[in-house]
């Protein structure tokens, strides 16, 4: 580590400017930490992020790294904290997300409403089928990577249940067809061969692959979300029901850090959070730059980012730990509990370490 000089006082050195490296990964979700990294705020804070390689990729689900921070979907951290390794992480912040998502059909499909899905072939991951059918089998005995992939089928499962409700249908009214689903079906060899766990490396050409599945005629509809949904729609596919218009389909993007850092290096954690908050505020006036850096991280077009995350997502990047944000996380936790994907609830208020975010926000009041 090296100390840097405070530009306002050349004769001094700042503890907050000590250079540190943290292992890092992010899911394909909007987040202030990625923004802080790509826009220079972390560099100014003396922090570098070392993105997980594909060969290190299991850490993205196990959190088994002493100096690790992750910004992504809420299901993996809930499983780690509630099922496998309680106390390994602390919750630093939440970014609510409600973007484009739904079950898509070909443009020439006769399906125009949810009720038209009756008797149709719905393509979902094998993980989602296990959840929807209540057939978890050996779920609790699986290794962390495969276990988490099963639980990630929750995204499709919840979306299908909500879609079918619009047509007053149930799961038994459609035919579930197993297909490979991006973000859920990630074989170990695919992970290990990926340069990093960035979306651009791990999930290339998602929309093209999904469009090909629809074109094959093997299924009548399949699920897509996030910027991938925007790119799939650009191929001519259309959602049967735009679930992005329904608040029940909002998710909590969760930011965690190794608990050991909170205990042993609170100053480092504070610098990290300060940089993310500053970047989140900066993003409000730099929407084009923020959109571009997210697009590059995921390997998608800037237009797809706006569709997948919401046109004004740049205004909402500052992490939160307020009641509504925690309630959003609790809603996902309840789905996991109801479907036996989680055995005991995580006490979210105890998991959270709000002092860092509170300190950062107070700097701007």
UniProtKB/Swiss-Prot annotation:
Q: What is its main location?
A: cytoplasm
Q: Would you say which domain of life the source belongs to?
A: Bacteria
How is this protein activated or inhibited?
Inhibited by the end product HBP.
Q: What happens when the gene is disrupted?
A: Blocks the desulfurization of DBT to 2-HBP, accumulates an unknown intermediate that is not DBTO2.
* SUPFAM superfamilies listed in its UniProt record: Periplasmic binding protein-like II
User: Where in or outside the cell?
Assistant: Cytoplasm
GO CC term (a single one): cytoplasm
GO biological process per UniProt = dibenzothiophene catabolic process
Q: Any idea which UniProt keywords this protein has? A: Cytoplasm, Hydrolase, Monooxygenase, Oxidoreductase, Plasmid
Query: In chain numbering, where does the site feature May orient the sulfinate group fall?
Result: 60
User: Its induction, per UniProt?
Assistant: Expressed during growth on DBT or DMSO as sole sulfur source; this protein accumulates to lower levels than DszA or DszC (at protein level). Part of the probable dszA-dszB-dszC operon. Desulfurization is repressed by sulfate, cysteine and methionine.
Q: How is it used?
A: Can be used to remove sulfur from polycyclic aromatic sulfur compounds found in gasoline and diesel (biodesulfurization), which are a considerable source of pollution. In addition it may be possible to engineer the operon to make specialty chemicals.
What is the E.C. number?
3.13.1.3
- Reactions catalysed according to its record: 2'-hydroxybiphenyl-2-sulfinate + H2O = biphenyl-2-ol + sulfite + H(+)
Catalytic center residues: 27, 70
The UniProt record gives the binding positions of 2'-hydroxybiphenyl-2-sulfinate as 27, 60, 70
Record-linked CDD domains: PBP2_DszB (cd13554)
Q: In which pathway does it act?
A: Sulfur metabolism; dibenzothiophene degradation
**Which top EC class is given?**
hydrolase
What terms describe the molecular function in GO for this protein? 2'-hydroxybiphenyl-2-sulfinate desulfinase activity; monooxygenase activity
User: Which family does the similarity line name?
Assistant: Belongs to the DszB desulfinase family.
Q: In UniProt terms, what function does this protein have?
A: Catalyzes the third and final step of the '4S' desulfurization pathway that removes covalently bound sulfur from dibenzothiophene (DBT) without breaking carbon-carbon bonds. Oxidizes 2-(2'-hydroxyphenyl)benzene sulphinate (HBPS) to 2-hydroxybiphenyl (HBP) plus sulfite. The rate-limiting step of the '4S' desulfurization pathway. The pathway substrate specificity has been augmented using mutagenesis, however no mutations allowed use of alkylated thiophenes.
* Domain remark text: Has 2 domains; domain A (residues 1-97 and 252-365) and domain B (residues 98-251). The active site with bound substrates is found between them. Upon substrate binding His-60 moves into the active site.
Q: How does it assemble?
A: Monomer.
Q: What is this protein called?
A: 2'-hydroxybiphenyl-2-sulfinate desulfinase
Q: Which organism is it from?
A: Rhodococcus qingshengii
């Amino acid at each position: 580590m090296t100390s840097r000089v405070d530009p306002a006082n050349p004769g001094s050195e700042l503890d907050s400017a000590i250079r540190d490296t943290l292992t890092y990964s992010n899911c394909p979700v909007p987040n202030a930490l990625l923004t802080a990294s790509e826009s220079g705020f972390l560099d100014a804070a003396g922090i570098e992020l070392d993105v997980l390689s594909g060969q290190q990729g299991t850490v993205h689900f196990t959190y088994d790294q002493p100096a690790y921070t992750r910004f992504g979907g809420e299901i993996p951290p809930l499983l780690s904290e509630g099922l496998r390794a309680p106390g390994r992480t602390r919750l630093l912040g939440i970014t609510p997300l409600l973007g484009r998502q739904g079950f898509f059909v070909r443009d020439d499909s006769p399906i125009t409403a949810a009720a038209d899905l009756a008797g149709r072939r719905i393509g979902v991951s094998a993980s989602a089928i296990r959840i929807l059918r209540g057939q978890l089998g050996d779920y609790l005995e699986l290794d962390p990577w495969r276990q988490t992939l099963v639980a990630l089928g929750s995204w499709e499962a919840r979306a299908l249940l909500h879609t079918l409700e619009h047509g007053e249908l149930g799961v038994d009214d459609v035919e579930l067809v197993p297909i490979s689903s991006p973000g859920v079906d990630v074989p170990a060899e695919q992970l290990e061969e990926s340069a990093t766990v960035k979306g651009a490396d791990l999930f290339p050409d998602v929309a093209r692959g999904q469009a090909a599945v629809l074109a094959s005629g093997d299924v009548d509809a399949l699920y897509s979300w996030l910027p991938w949904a925007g790119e799939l729609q650009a191929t001519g596919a259309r959602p049967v029901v735009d679930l992005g218009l329904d608040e029940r389909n909002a998710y909590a993007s969760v930011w965690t850090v190794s608990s050991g850092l909170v205990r042993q290096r609170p100053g480092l954690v504070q610098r990290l959070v300060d940089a993310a908050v500053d970047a989140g505020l900066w993003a409000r006036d730099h929407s084009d730059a923020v959109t571009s850096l997210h697009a590059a991280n995921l390997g998608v077009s800037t237009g797809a980012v706006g569709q997948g995350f919401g046109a004004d997502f740049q205004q909402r990047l500052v992490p939160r730990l307020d009641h509504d944000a925690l309630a959003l996380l609790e809603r996902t936790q309840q789905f996991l509990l109801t479907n036996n994907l989680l055995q005991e609830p995580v006490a979210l208020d105890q998991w959270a370490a709000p002092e860092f975010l509170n300190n950062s926000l107070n700097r701007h009041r």
